């Protein structure tokens, strides 16, 4: 990583695209924490720069605060301390575009992750299209990730 000029590697386990699902990576990895942990361990072992994770608040039947907190806690064991969290779950069967609009946004779920893990760096993502929304989110989390123009 660093030898190529990168200062951080972010593993996106929040991508719901059909291609990603068929390859058992992306959001699929949120359903297989053992495999994800193994991947992160191998990556961490070979990196001298920070490794972060982008995820969703859930995927299909894997949802709710308990799932998300268990997911985050499991990755803490692998030394991950920065999370980019898309504030909606992914739904299999929806294309990527519809996965950005049909599942409802649940910003409070991301805020609760920060409340439960104040030492983690939590960056919120999803449906943020105005500067005022960015400013509001920063009252609850450490950063805002924009995927679209504002």
Regions found by a protein language model. Give the residues of each.
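Flavin-dependent oxidoreductase catalytic cores
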Residues: 1-150
């Amino acid at each position: 990583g660093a030898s190529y000029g990168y200062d951080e590697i972010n593993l996106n386990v929040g991508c719901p695209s059909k291609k990603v699902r068929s390859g058992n990576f992306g959001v699929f990895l949120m359903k297989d924490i053992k495999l994800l942990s193994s991947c992160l361990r191998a990556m961490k072992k070979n990196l001298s720069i920070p490794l972060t994770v982008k995820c969703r608040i859930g995927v299909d039947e894997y949802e709710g605060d308990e799932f998300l907190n268990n997911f985050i806690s499991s990755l803490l064991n692998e030394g991950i301390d920065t999370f980019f969290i898309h504030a909606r779950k992914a739904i299999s069967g929806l294309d990527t575009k519809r996965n950005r609009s049909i599942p409802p946004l649940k910003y409070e779920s991301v805020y609760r992750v920060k409340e439960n893990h104040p030492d983690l760096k939590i960056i919120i993502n999803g449906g943020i299209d105005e500067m005022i929304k960015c400013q509001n989110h920063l009252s609850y989390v450490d950063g805002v990730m924009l995927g679209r123009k504002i």
